[in-house]
Structure formats: structure tokens, C-alpha cells
């Protein structure tokens, strides 16, 4: 299957609410690789790779949130293949 890589920068209530660990747990559960990272401006960056279905499922779950997070806006960029072996939180 063709590998898809996306970079999302999400804004809203996404820091201080367990969002990064939520994203990490969802990504690992569905087999996506990459990372999630808090940014200084209060947004969160997510780089994720997997097959098309995995990426769509991750995005759907991210937009649903963890019950405390709320995404008001986001940017999406297609990326070339990245070399991550797992999904982790970057600091």
C-alpha cells in the first residue's frame, strides 16, 4: 500500500489538556508513525505517516478530541516519506 505522510498544525484548546498523549496513543493503536509536539504559540504540530485509511482515521480521531481538547483551526501539508519507526511525543 502507498504510504501517506501529513503534517498538521492544530490550534484551539490543545495544550494542557492531555492532547499530545491522546494523539500518541491513538496513532500507536492504529499503527501510524511520526510525532506530536507543542509549539511556543500554543498550537500543536503532528507529523504522521501510514496508509491512507490510517491517516484518515487518525485525523478523524484528532478532530473528535479527547473530551478536553477542542480544535478551532488547522493547517495541513502533504509531506514526502519520513523515516520514523514509531510514534512519539517530541519536546
Curated annotation (Swiss-Prot):
List of catalytic residues: 20, 38
Describe the reaction catalysed, as an equation. an acyl phosphate + H2O = a carboxylate + phosphate + H(+)
MF terms from GO for this chain are: acylphosphatase activity
Query: What are the entry keywords?
Result: Hydrolase
- EC number annotated for this UniProt entry: 3.6.1.7
Q: Does the keyword Hydrolase apply?
A: yes
Pfam families from the UniProt entry = Acylphosphatase (PF00708)
Q: Tell me the ranges covered by the Acylphosphatase-like domain, including all copies.
A: 5-91
Which InterPro entries has this protein been placed in? Acylphosphatase, Acylphosphatase-like_dom, Acylphosphatase-like_dom_sf, Acylphosphatase_CS
Is ATP-binding one of the keywords UniProt gives this record? no
According to its UniProt record, which protein family does this protein belong to? Belongs to the acylphosphatase family.
The record's listing under PANTHER family reads: ACYLPHOSPHATASE
- Protein name, please? Acylphosphatase
Protein source organism? Fervidobacterium nodosum (strain ATCC 35602 / DSM 5306 / Rt17-B1)
Organism classification, top ranks?
A: Bacteria, Thermotogati, Thermotogota, Thermotogae, Thermotogales
